[in-house]
């Protein structure tokens, strides 16, 4: 009964299946003709292409409703290079190719398929069939696989409604085709008796695709770029034609293209179709096959076997290259290297041979490689041996690497050479566990223990190889991803290396190896190191850097780890900055950026805050397409911050992005420095270069870096050792130093100061230079105490340099020969095609470099000579290729760009010290009978290669150069010959007149430049002589006509100024002067020369100078006389005032310049220029408006600003040749065009051949410029031109030192009641008649101390004591004069210079310190220190200068307190000479910390009377000048003079009323619109000339506070 029921159900199921879904009737045989076409060429119909036509008859027997049996017969194929056409080529137009019997038998083997719902669900092949043959048969079955209707459960209501109307139907469904399991879109159209089914494949929605990719693991993920980069996904369309429910024809068309900059450059195309021939009953059954069931999807089994062989070597189960006999491989390699040896010079053909050798080596077993070694390598010349070594390393298979390591251990390859070869192994295309294990064994071998470069290269290479199979990259290998156990294995190995390391370098190397590996599981180990405070800082920083390759794998995890590190102020600043730097490359989201900005705004360490701001700002400005989202987020987040960094911060990050967003291509240069207060050297310096080409992002294409920890200790120790031979003979100075040290020690004892000992170990101090290439650490160069000691011991004997050893090393003649073959890059991608052949898209750049030469150094008594004789030869070819492969045929298209350079060179350099001169000579020699060649060749090539049937001898491909006809017409022939300097130069070729990169790739071009010398050697000589300074008379300097009418001052002061000027010149001329002569002679063959003399005459203080330059050269083309140039420059600067009073009273405050030049050959041009560097009208008003009397430090700081010269007046008279006049005119036109929007001009009639120029810079912001130029015919005015912030010159005495301290130093101010520390913490603390320690070097070997006290209880005047290691200096002000005592003895003002003391003006004295200086005006002590000096080794009321605001109050015995009184008392020096004012000290109102760490606010106000609106430094901190705007309905009013406002981020704390004048103008007027725009960024200076509309009282802030 059960069997009856089952049979009934089966019958019902069969009956229910619609006949429409049955393509073939059971028990019938169908014959179809199959045609397949391969086309490779350019994406244009007008060029030739390589085309292969394959045809056969297909017998198809429908056994039942589900199974069909198939067999191919009458197989033939033809291939040729013919023009492209939309039609199928006729078989007669192609060359018939012979198919071997072996291949024909394979293709004729039967196969069986199961059909379900019209689709091929299972396939069975003969057990004797080959994989490539199976894929060919799949392509035919692929044409019979068709779903005639949408699955009912997937049809929506509209489709169901349309089902009733068969005229048209569309549906999407996932379906397995030859190219993968992807979404397919069906369209069904009824045309009479015919039904046409069309389906297209959507490759964006694939579940699986049989594809591989190698060599892409060095790229980074760029989400904003096209995911496939240059490769465009294939376009595949199927068309099925049914007539009366029978399949008449089925065709598939696929196109594969490569895009560059959005344009197709090469393409490959496949077409396949089956055409119905006949239908009949089955007469002769096709043999049923019973092989394993397989899918219709392309089988990558053959590719998998190849990959396994590359990765596992002889341990692979199957050798896919076994068919090629050993003798045949050796013969091919022998022929390759024979041809390379015959090529004396490297050519593109040599590069092609190297690429072939690499391909052959990848096919070799260990035995075959041994045969190559004994047969070829041992008998070859050195060049071929070196090339064989590098090609084996580039091949990068397990067998080639094992073979190389075997010879490393036998030392037949030197360890240094082995280390070099391992750099190529790092880039292997086929990384595997087997290769990684080999490298780790090498790194741990006794050989590597002896040779550090080899060991380092082995570890770094092992890490890079591990990344290839154990980390997520863009590679798509066929082997399964590494298991967790495998990852844990290598993490354990690398961490064991770290734990076993004894030195810092060893630990750094272990972490760089782990960083190269990029294993996700390593993050847990790295986090432990980063968070372990017991680890050295350099190790923790290196662990942060080791996370770099995980940015795409686990960005959120890295952010979670590094954000707390960055925010934790207990961590060192350089660690925090490194964490931020690494975190930003994970492209954080806005919440993370908000945390970063919040930390920046509340940051107490200014280095960290400034670095953070710069990083955010640079990412916000980036045009890198891969940072687009991050740039948007950074721009949003920066809108809400008020933080502005200090200008002098050295820790910074900057980038230079150069990108084309349309092409998704460009480059970016990054530069970052990380400084710390305790070091003069940067803790970290990085310079990197990253690229994006066609959306492919190489984040760390190249990077060089330097990191160090306490390396200053190494330098100091080394200098101490080198100074052993220096004998000190000055006993007096020695006694003075001992006296100073004793006084410093007494201060330490009396104040109970605990020395600030830096926790640094000089033995652990180290520095590391590293090179990173393609995201891999490539080279690590450590420098530590041991390395320095080795060098010192080698070249220093008994405290003196061992000159003999050094001379022996330098004077040895050194011949060298270098040959290196390498692939700059190699990438490969393989995808299936609908014709059953794999399509390989590859790019590579094989290169060979050879350098033969000799270098020698000859040392003489007073000179040295270097001779370098080399012949470099470079050849390289960039290959972009699309290739189809079958055992019977290989076809494709490639674009080649080749370059070659061969240039013999000889260079000689001599340095000789003669009696009165230093002579340096450089000589460049072009050898005789030698040719220099530079050639470039580009061409697209279509190729076909058909192997011979009899043997596997290598057959050259049949190539045909193809080109884009339209682009080719744009090329032009070049054939030019020159003869110059006795050298024959030939330039010839065929190049594009206008080109783009796609045009270059699609056209044939060639260009060759040759330089040949058939006569004697041609020498080019440059000789520089520098004479000694000689005394001379200054009377020869004449300032005759130097003042022009345009230089006259207002108020008729010009005559007085001129008299003052000439009197000053006469006084200077009465003094002794000095002169110097420098000559430069350039000599070339054929009496070509350029000789220059530069003569300088100046006084001792460089107040007046005369510079003359004479030049002459040999006549050039169209010249019949020697060309000469004679110039003279006179310069005189005014006296440098040291007080405002001197500045006001000084009649002459300008710098005068006079310049004359005369040049030409037969006709001479002459120009005379008088220039005056002066103060503008606004700047002079500023000086006149200084109504209050300033003294001391504020006076000097104001003097620097008041003495700025911000305007230059130039008057030029000229007599020019027409050619010179035209050149100057064009330059002038360019300047006007560049500043089109800010220029105005009018026609005038001025004096002929005379030009007047006035240029003035706005003195406050120094970012805007006005310029007026008057020519004989026009007056041109440029207003408000924005320029980079400039440093204006100032004539104030010693101004340069002060400005340097302001920009790069740290400053502390102390007066009788308030202290502003080095770290900008302001607090109140009263000084008494007992000394308070202002600042002191509190290291174990102190060098200075600065103390201050009140002269008496009721006085505001102070007395300052400076103790240096040499002496004790006491300074006080008495009767407006400074009284200076050194070691208790009064010193006259004329003797102060020998004690490094200087008096500026009447109210300021400067005392130099070993590092820094002290400025004192009687009331305020200002101590300037370098911003990177003595972190945690300074103490005193001025703090520790460590950049942190949170730890200023460290008492004398080195513990932190929040009680300012306790802090102050700890630095009181109590003795019998003073009376402690306990009442004043204990009174709490005298203490106030204006930087509260908990509330993070700055509410201090300036208590000094002299801090004016013109004090730029304080203005930048608190107040800024702005034009006040009042807006009404129809008018806008502007304040005529600038009004003070609190800078952004601050609020007014105190205000005062001031009457302000306003001028009003209509809102619609041009001036109103312009002034509104200018007032947003600067003060509007032009308003002074407008009438006053009204006066109004306005509240002006006098002090600001930040909340």
From Swiss-Prot:
Expressed in the intestine of adult hermaphrodites. Residues 1-15 form the signal peptide. It comes from the Eukaryota. It is found in: Secreted. One of its GO terms (molecular function) is lipid transporter activity. Keywords: Disulfide bond, Secreted, Signal, Storage protein. Vitellogenin 5 undergoes little if any processing before being packaged into yolk platelets. Disulfide bonds join 1308-1438, 1330-1474. GO terms for cellular component: extracellular region. Residues 1306-1475 form the VWFD domain. Residues 1492-1513 are annotated as: Disordered. SUPFAM superfamilies: Lipovitellin-phosvitin complex, beta-sheet shell regions, Lipovitellin-phosvitin complex, superhelical domain. PROSITE patterns: VITELLOGENIN, VWFD. It holds the Pfam family Vitellogenin_N. Its main location: secreted. Residues 24-685 form the Vitellogenin domain. Precursor of the egg-yolk proteins that are sources of nutrients during embryonic development. Together with other vitellogenins, may play a role in modulating life-span, acting via induction of autophagy and lysosomal lipolysis. This is Vitellogenin-5. The gene is vit-5.
């Amino acid at each position: 009964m059960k069997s009856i029921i089952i049979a009934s159900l089966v019958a019902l199921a069969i009956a229910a299946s619609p006949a429409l879904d049955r393509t073939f009737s059971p028990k019938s045989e169908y014959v179809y003709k199959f045609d397949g076409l391969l086309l490779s060429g350019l994406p244009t119909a007008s060029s030739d292409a390589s085309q292969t036509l394959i045809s056969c008859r297909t017998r198809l027997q429908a056994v039942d409703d589900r199974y069909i049996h198939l067999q191919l017969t009458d197989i033939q194929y033809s291939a040729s290079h013919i023009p492209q056409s939309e039609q199928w080529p006729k078989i007669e137009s192609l060359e018939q190719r012979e198919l071997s019997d072996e291949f024909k038998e394979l293709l004729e083997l039967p196969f069986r398929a199961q059909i379900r719902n019209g689709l091929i669900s299972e396939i069975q092949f003969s057990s004797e069939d080959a994989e490539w043959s199976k894929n060919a048969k799949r392509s035919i079955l692929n044409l019979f696989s068709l779903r005639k209707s949408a699955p009912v459960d997937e049809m929506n209501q509209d489709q169901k409604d349309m089902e009733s109307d068969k005229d048209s139907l569309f549906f999407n469904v996932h379906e397995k085709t030859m190219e993968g399991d992807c979404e397919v879109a069906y369209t069904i159209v009824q045309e009479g008796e015919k039904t046409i089914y069309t389906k297209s494949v959507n490759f964006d929605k694939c579940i699986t695709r049989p594809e591989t990719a190698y060599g892409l693991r060095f790229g980074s993920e760029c989400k904003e770029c096209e995911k496939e980069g240059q490769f465009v996904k294939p376009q595949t369309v199927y068309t099925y034609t049914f007539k009366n429910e029978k399949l008449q024809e089925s065709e598939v068309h696929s196109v594969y293209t490569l895009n560059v900059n959005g344009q197709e450059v090469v393409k490959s195309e496949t077409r396949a179709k089956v055409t119905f021939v006949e239908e009949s009953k089955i007469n002769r059954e096709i043999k049923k096959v019973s092989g394993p069931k397989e899918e219709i999807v392309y089988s990558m089994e053959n590719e998998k076997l190849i990959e396994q062989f590359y990765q596992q070597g002889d341990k692979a189960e199957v050798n896919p290259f076994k068919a090629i006999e050993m003798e045949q491989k050796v013969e091919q390699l022998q022929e390759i290297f024979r041809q390379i040896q015959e090529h004396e010079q490297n050519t593109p053909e040599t590069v092609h041979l190297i690429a072939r050798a690499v391909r052959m080596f990848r096919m070799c077993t260990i035995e075959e490689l041994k045969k190559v070694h004994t047969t070829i390598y041992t008998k070859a010349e050195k060049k071929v041996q070196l090339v064989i070594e590098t090609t084996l390393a580039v091949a990068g298979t397990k067998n080639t690497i094992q073979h190389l390591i075997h010879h490393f251990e036998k030392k037949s390859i030197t360890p240094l050479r082995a280390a070099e070869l391992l750099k190529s192994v790092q880039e292997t295309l086929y990384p595997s566990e087997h290769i990684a294990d080999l490298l780790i064994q090498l790194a741990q071998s006794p050989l590597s223990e002896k040779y550090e470069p080899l060991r380092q290269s082995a570890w770094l290479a092992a890490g890079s190889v591990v990344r290839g199979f154990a980390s997520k990259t863009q590679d798509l290998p066929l082997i399964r991803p590494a298991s967790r156990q495998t990852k844990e294995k290598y993490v354990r190995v690398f961490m064991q290396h770290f734990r076993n390391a004894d030195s810092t370098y060893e630990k750094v190397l272990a972490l760089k190896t782990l960083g190269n590996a990029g294993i996700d599981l390593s993050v847990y180990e790295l986090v432990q190191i980063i968070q372990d405070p017991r680890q050295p800082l350099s190790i923790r920083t290196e662990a942060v850097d080791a996370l770099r390759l995980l940015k795409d794998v686990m960005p959120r995890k890295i952010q979670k780890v590094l954000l707390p590190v960055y925010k934790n102020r207990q961590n060192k600043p350089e660690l925090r900055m490194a964490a931020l730097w690494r975190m930003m490359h994970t492209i954080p989201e806005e919440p993370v950026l908000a945390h970063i900005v919040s930390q920046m705004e509340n940051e107490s360490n200014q280095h960290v805050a400034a670095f953070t701001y710069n990083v955010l700002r640079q990412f916000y400005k980036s045009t890198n397409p891969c940072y687009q989202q991050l740039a948007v987020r950074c721009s949003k987040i920066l809108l809400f911050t008020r933080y502005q960094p200090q200008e002098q911060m050295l820790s910074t990050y900057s980038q230079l992005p150069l990108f084309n967003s349309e092409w998704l291509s460009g480059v970016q240069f990054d530069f970052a420095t990380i400084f710390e207060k305790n070091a003069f050297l940067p803790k970290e310096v990085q310079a990197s270069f990253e690229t994006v080409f066609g959306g492919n992002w190489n984040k760390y294409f190249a990077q060089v870096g330097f990191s160090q920890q306490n390396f200053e200790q190494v330098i100091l120790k080394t200098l101490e050792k080198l100074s052993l031979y220096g004998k000190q003979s000055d006993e007096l100075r020695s006694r003075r130093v001992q006296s100073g040290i004793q006084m410093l020690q007494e201060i330490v004892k009396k104040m109970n100061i605990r020395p600030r000992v830096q926790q640094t170990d000089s033995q652990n101090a180290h520095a590391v230079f590293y090179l990173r290439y393609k995201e891999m650490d490539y080279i690590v160069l450590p420098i530590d105490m041991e390395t320095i000691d080795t060098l010192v011991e080698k070249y220093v004997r008994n405290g003196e340099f061992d000159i003999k050893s050094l001379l022996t090393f330098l004077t040895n003649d050194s011949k060298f020969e270098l040959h290196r073959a390498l692939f700059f890059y190699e990438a490969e991608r393989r995808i299936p095609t609908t014709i059953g052949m794999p399509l390989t898209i590859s790019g590579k750049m094989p290169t060979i470099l050879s350098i033969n030469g000799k270098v020698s150094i000859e040392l003489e008594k007073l000179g040295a000579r270097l001779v370098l004789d080399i012949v470099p030869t470079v050849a390289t070819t960039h290959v972009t290729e699309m290739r189809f492969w079958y055992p019977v045929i290989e076809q494709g298209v490639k674009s080649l760009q080749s370059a070659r350079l061969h240039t013999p060179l000889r260079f000689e350099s001599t340095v000789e010290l003669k009696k009165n001169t230093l002579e340096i000579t450089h000589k460049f020699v072009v050898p005789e009978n030698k040719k220099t060649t530079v050639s470039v060749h580009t061409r697209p090539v279509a190729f076909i290669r058909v192997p011979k049937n009899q043997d596997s001898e290598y057959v050259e491909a049949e190539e045909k150069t193809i080109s884009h006809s339209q682009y080719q017409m744009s090329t032009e022939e070049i054939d030019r010959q020159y003869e110059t300097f006795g050298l024959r130069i030939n330039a010839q070729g065929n190049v594009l007149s206008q080109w783009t990169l796609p045009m270059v790739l699609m056209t044939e071009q060639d260009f060759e430049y040759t330089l040949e010398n058939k006569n004697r050697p041609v020498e080019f000589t440059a000789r520089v002589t520098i004479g000694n300074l000689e005394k001379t008379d200054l009377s020869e300097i004449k300032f005759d006509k130097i003042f022009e009418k345009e230089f006259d001052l207002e108020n008729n002061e010009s005559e007085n100024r001129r008299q003052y000027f000439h009197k000053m010149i006469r006084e200077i001329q009465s003094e002794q002067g000095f002169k110097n002569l420098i000559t430069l002679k350039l000599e070339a063959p054929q009496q070509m020369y350029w000789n220059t003399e530069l003569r300088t005459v100046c006084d001792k203080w460089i107040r007046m100078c005369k510079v003359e330059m004479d030049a002459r050269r040999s006549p050039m083309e169209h010249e019949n006389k020697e060309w000469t140039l004679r110039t003279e420059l006179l310069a005189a600067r005014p006296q440098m005032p040291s007080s405002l009073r001197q500045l006001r009273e000084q009649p002459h405050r300008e710098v005068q310049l006079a310049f004359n030049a005369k040049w030409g050959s037969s006709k001479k041009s002459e120009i005379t220029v008088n220039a005056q560097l002066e103060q503008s009208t606004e700047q002079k008003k500023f000086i006149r408006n200084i109504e209050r009397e300033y003294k001391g430090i504020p006076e000097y700081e104001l003097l620097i600003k008041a003495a700025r010269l911000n305007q230059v007046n130039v008057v030029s008279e000229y007599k020019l040749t027409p050619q010179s006049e035209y050149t100057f005119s064009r330059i002038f036109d360019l300047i006007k065009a560049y500043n089109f929007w800010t220029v105005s001009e009018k026609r005038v009639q001025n004096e002929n051949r005379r030009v007047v120029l006035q240029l003035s810079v706005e003195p406050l912001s120094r970012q805007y410029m006005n310029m007026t130029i008057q020519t004989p015919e026009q007056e041109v005015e440029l207003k408000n031109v924005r320029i980079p912030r400039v440093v204006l010159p100032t004539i104030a005495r010693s101004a340069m030192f002060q400005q340097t301290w302001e920009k790069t130093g740290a400053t502390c101010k102390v007066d009788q009641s308030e202290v502003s520390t080095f770290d900008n913490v302001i607090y109140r603390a009263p000084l008494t008649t007992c000394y308070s320690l202002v600042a002191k070097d509190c290291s174990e070997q102190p060098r200075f101390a600065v103390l201050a006290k009140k002269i008496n209880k009721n006085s505001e005047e102070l007395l300052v004591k400076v103790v240096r290691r040499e002496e004790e200096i006491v300074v006080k002000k008495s009767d407006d004069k400074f009284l200076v005592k050194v070691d208790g003895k009064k010193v006259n003002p004329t003797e102060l210079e020998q004690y490094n003391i200087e008096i500026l003006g009447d109210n300021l004295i400067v005392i130099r310190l070993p590092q820094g200086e002290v400025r004192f005006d009687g009331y305020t002590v200002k101590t300037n220190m370098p911003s990177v000096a003595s972190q945690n080794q300074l103490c005193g009321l001025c703090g520790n200068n460590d950049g942190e605001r949170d730890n200023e109050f460290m008492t004398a015995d080195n513990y932190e307190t929040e009680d300012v009184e306790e802090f102050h008392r700890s630095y009181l020096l109590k003795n019998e000479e003073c009376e402690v004012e306990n009442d004043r000290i204990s009174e709490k109102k005298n203490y106030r910390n204006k930087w509260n760490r908990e509330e993070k606010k700055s509410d201090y106000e300036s208590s000094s009377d002299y801090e004016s609106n013109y004090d730029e430094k304080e203005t930048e901190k608190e107040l800024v000048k702005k034009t006040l705007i009042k807006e009404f309905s129809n008018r806008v009013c502007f304040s005529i003079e600038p009004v003070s406002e609190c800078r952004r981020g601050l609020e007014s704390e105190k205000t005062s009323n001031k009457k302000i004048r306003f001028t009003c103008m209509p809102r619609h007027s041009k001036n109103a619109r312009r002034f509104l725009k200018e007032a947003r960024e600067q003060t509007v200076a032009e308003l002074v000339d407008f009438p006053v509309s009204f006066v109004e009282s306005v509240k002006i802030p006098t002090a600001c506070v930040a909340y």
